[in-house]
Amino acid sequence: MKKHAIAVMMIAVFSESVYAESALFIPDVSPDSVTTSLSVGVLNGKSRELVYDTDTGRKLSQLDWKIKNVATLQGDLSWEPYSFMTLDARGWTSLASGSGHMVDHDWMSSEQPGWTDRSIHPDTSVNYANEYDLNVKGWLLQGDNYKAGVTAGYQETRFSWTARGGSYIYDNGRYIGNFPHGVRGIGYSQRFEMPYIGLAGDYRINDFECNVLFKYSDWVNAHDNDEHYMRKLTFREKTENSRYYGASIDAGYYITSNAKIFAEFAYSKYEEGKGGTQIIDKTSGDTAYFGGDAAGIANNNYTVTAGLQYRF
């Protein structure tokens, strides 16, 4: 009888231990494991479109496309299935077409360091801009009011512009004039896609909370499309394995136990990637391809947003 009692006690202790361990691996599906946020803000930045002589590496052309105070809407949905893990989906998009600016410089002479041709296009619109980001965070260090860890994710970002009208100076000032007002000259779009790694941190004191995030990628693939409407030419470029750096910080205050108002600043830098270019003649249908480092694609941008976060 005594042996049976001991056996029952051992089975009970073992079962409780197994249950406790298995419970650690059961994801939290309660509503308070889910957090969502919505914010509005502005986007600013600049993209560069470059053309090179593949034989000498000399820069032949550079177009600077600016983004100026474009209104954005940003959303975030995160789930914390375990105390040491957070799954997150977030993104932002322009709310409408916005203001931009474009300057086009050409270096047609190898015998002079300065540009030979320039056109300026103040009437440039940002047709759209958007980004989405899917990531997972693993919290390696946790305390009562802080946590820090690593992150990995996938991100895609897109921009599009149209330049109309403008003025030009060609052949070192030999030809000076204006393009027809309101007529499309050049349309340009970029797309960046990449996996990334990074570091994340969170700190809270009373009702104040601050979050920081650093992201890095050495595996950026970039695509662009350049439509020269007046010349009826299309230029398409693709680059691989360029670098990206990103950082964001947000600070907020809990107005209730579940709701927080916050402001965020986020910065992204896509370093120049170089690759081949395809040229399509829209009139004849002829195409040509130049391999090597014939073209370059780059962008840097930042957003400033403010909004509301809610934990269910």
UniProtKB/Swiss-Prot annotation:
Question: Which residues are the active-site ones?
Answer: D104, D106, D226, H228
Q: What is its main location?
A: membrane
List the GO molecular function terms. Answer: aspartic-type endopeptidase activity
Organism's domain of life? Bacteria
Subcellular location per UniProt equals:
Cell outer membrane
Q: How does it sit in the membrane?
A: Multi-pass membrane protein
Q: Where is the signal peptide?
A: 1-37
Instruction: Supply the enzyme class, top level.
Output: hydrolase
GO BP term, pick one: proteolysis
What family does this belong to? Belongs to the peptidase A26 family.
Q: What does this protein do?
A: Protease that can cleave T7 RNA polymerase. Specific for paired basic residues.
Q: Which NCBIfam families match?
A: PRK10993.1-3
Protein name per UniProt: Outer membrane protease E
